[in-house]
Amino acid sequence: MGVDPARIEEAALNALQTQRQMFFDGWLLRLSPGKAKRARSVNPHFGSSLPLDGKIDRCERLYGASGLPTLFRVTPFAKPPDLDAALERRGYVAFDNTLVQVATSGARRAGRRDPGVHLHEVGIAAFVDAVAALRGSPAVQRDAHLERLAHSPLATHAIVARADGRPVACGQMSFDGEFAGIYDMVTAAAWRGRGAATAIVDALLAHAHACGAANVFLQVNDDNPAALAVYRKFGFVTAYTYHYRARPTECA
């Protein structure tokens, strides 16, 4: 599609900003107590000058002091290039292999959905409440999610699918120039395969197209065949992949 993966990564980092983050010798350390690992992990994207082992030690101390596991998000843009191997030597294991996929906003697909499901455009607080209800999130994760979205510098468009007044699926989109990113796609187990997620993606793509965002990206675990099947309908293809590394007892 001719889309620069580095630009997608930049837009994704912009959308997942948190009030609790700092730079350390070119690494972006995010320290949110929320559910999203992208907002509570080390993102090593910039040049580095300090000895690598000492930097990792410092990260472990900082995350430990914050009551968080030390997670490293390893992308094709990670620096130094031997970081992944260095973490493996220290006993860090790789997990949550994630596909970053991209499609054009014109890739619409009107699908059939349960007639009892209705889509609603909602504000940030209502959206976060719906996500928390669908995930069964504890209050600390719900509050961190609200903090992150409420203070985002990017415009957000959120949709909740409801049946009998209850949320059954949701998804939101953040805008960054010619890019729009889809996040927080969640569907209640009893409603999977009934068209709710497809309808939300279709509506989000329509909104992106109307707003002039030509390219839409999302991130999905490679072991989620149901979600991959939905995204495939809209022509999403993988631009690059990333994974996390953590101690075996902290892979969460």
Enumerate the predicted regions with their spans.
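Conserved acetyl-CoA-binding loop-helix of GNAT-fold acetyltransferases
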Residues: L52-E60, D184-A189, G193-A210, A229-K233
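N-terminal charged segments
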Residues: M1-A65, K79, V140
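Acyl-donor-binding surface of acyltransferase catalytic domains
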Residues: L50-A125, R245-A246
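Conserved beta-strand-loop-alpha-helix junction that forms the acyl-donor binding cleft
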Residues: V74-P81, L218-L228, R245-C251
